[in-house]
């Protein structure tokens, strides 16, 4: 009786409904400020390359480090471009690290990205250390996002970036102009304190909750402050040059990455379909083999034994078919791995020309920025000693 139930349960089904997800292709509108923001109150934004999230993956995830590294930069740059279109901010830059002092910081982690679904954990805080947002964003896209016939070059996951931008703007609009100006002042004082702690340490203090507050302000004609502002202008020059690098990188990888993501989407959907079909076929095959063996053992007639043999043979065919479909799914995933490797050439080190020097990015961008910071510190001390 139990065997009969098993054979009944594992009989292959022909219907495959419910495998593909239904998604919306409607573009989410990007919000703009409710009222114009004065230039002096426009906050600068720094977006660090996202954490690749590789430490959160397991052996079953089809994740390739070289792709995730590229995505970490690409996604940050995509968010920057979306936020720029809102007209609600000052300079929006992808920065090498959160060591770059700015008014608003955006960081995050890639939790999932396979061409079909993207999940990001995003954190936003300001120069005071006050957290604005800590939220998980998720979007699942459909096959039409990759339909070449639609000639749609928009990012398939643009809605996710728009939602992040809208949420950040929503928090920004809760701030008064005075509070925004205070944030900009704190950013300047933090930068000044970094280069001359003995001169600027007393101007800002840390409250019990860990956020910063202004104790008092230096004179506008303070010579040390004026030198620090010149140093900060040079820092902006470097960061803007780095933004050109990030923009160029994103443009270079865009078409190749969209092809990769389209293939990844198709592979993920196909692999899921094959995996589900394969599981049913494998279990059905095992059940049919057991039924055939059980029937041969219990049958006392030739006809019964022949029927049982046929049942077992059918079960063997179904089992083989199921395993072949699983192997086919693995082949699709392997194809994604090959495409991921092809992106390595587009994240090679580049040479950046500055006004009076050339910076070669042979290591990490963060490492290069640390060298730049050390150079600025040296320039500041030389200029201060010359006065």
Question: Model segments located where?
Answer:
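Acidic helix-start/capping segments at beta-turn-to-alpha-helix junctions
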Residues: 93-109, 183-190
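C-terminal/domain-edge helix-coil "capping" segments
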Residues: 15-40, 140-279, 297-303, 316-387
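N-terminal segment of the mature soluble domain
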Residues: 41-100, 130, 163, 167, ...
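Amphipathic beta-strand/beta-sheet edge segments enriched in Tyr/Trp
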Residues: 107-148
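Short, glycine/alanine-rich hydrophobic alpha-helices that insert into or span membranes
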Residues: 281-293, 311-317
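Bacterial N-terminal signal peptides
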Residues: 1-9
């Amino acid at each position: 009786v139990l065997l009969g139930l098993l054979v009944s349960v594992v009989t292959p089904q022909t219907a495959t409904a419910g495998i593909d997800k239904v998604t919306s292709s409607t573009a989410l509108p990007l919000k703009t400020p409710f009222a114009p923001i004065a230039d002096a109150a426009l906050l600068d934004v720094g977006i660090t390359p996202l954490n690749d999230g590789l430490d959160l993956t397991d052996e079953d995830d089809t994740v390739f480090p070289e792709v995730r590294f590229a995505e970490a930069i690409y996604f940050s740059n995509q968010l920057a471009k979306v936020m720029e279109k809102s007209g609600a901010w000052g300079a929006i830059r992808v920065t090498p690290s959160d060591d770059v002092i700015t008014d608003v910081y955006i960081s995050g982690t890639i939790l999932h990205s396979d061409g079909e679904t993207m999940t990001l954990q995003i954190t936003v805080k300001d120069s005071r250390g006050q957290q604005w947002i800590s939220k998980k964003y998720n979007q699942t896209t459909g096959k039409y996002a990759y339909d070449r016939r639609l000639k749609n070059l928009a990012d398939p996951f643009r809605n996710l970036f728009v939602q992040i931008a809208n949420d950040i703007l929503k928090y920004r609009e809760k701030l008064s102009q005075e509070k925004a100006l205070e944030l900009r002042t704190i950013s300047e004082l933090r930068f000044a304190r970094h280069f001359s702690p003995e001169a600027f340490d007393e101007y800002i203090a840390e409250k019990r909750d860990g956020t910063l507050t202004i104790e008092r302000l230096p004179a506008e004609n303070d010579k040390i402050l004026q030198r620090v502002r010149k140093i900060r202008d040079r820092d902006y020059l470097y960061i803007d040059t780095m933004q050109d690098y990030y923009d160029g990188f994103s443009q270079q990888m865009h078409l190749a990455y969209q092809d990769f993501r389209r293939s990844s989407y198709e592979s993920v959907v196909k692999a899921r379909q094959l995996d589900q079909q394969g599981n049913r076929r494998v279990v059905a095959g095992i059940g049919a083999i057991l039924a055939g063996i059980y029937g041969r053992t219990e049958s006392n007639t030739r006809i019964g034994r022949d029927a049982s043999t046929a049942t077992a043979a059918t079960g063997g065919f179904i089992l083989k078919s199921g395993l072949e479909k699983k192997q086919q799914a693995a082949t699709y995933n392997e194809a994604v791995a090959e495409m991921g490797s092809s992106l390595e050439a587009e994240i090679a080190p580049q040479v950046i020309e500055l006004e009076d020097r050339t910076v070669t990015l042979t290591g990490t961008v963060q490492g290069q920025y640390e060298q730049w910071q050390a150079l600025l510190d040296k320039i500041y001390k030389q200029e201060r000693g010359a006065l």
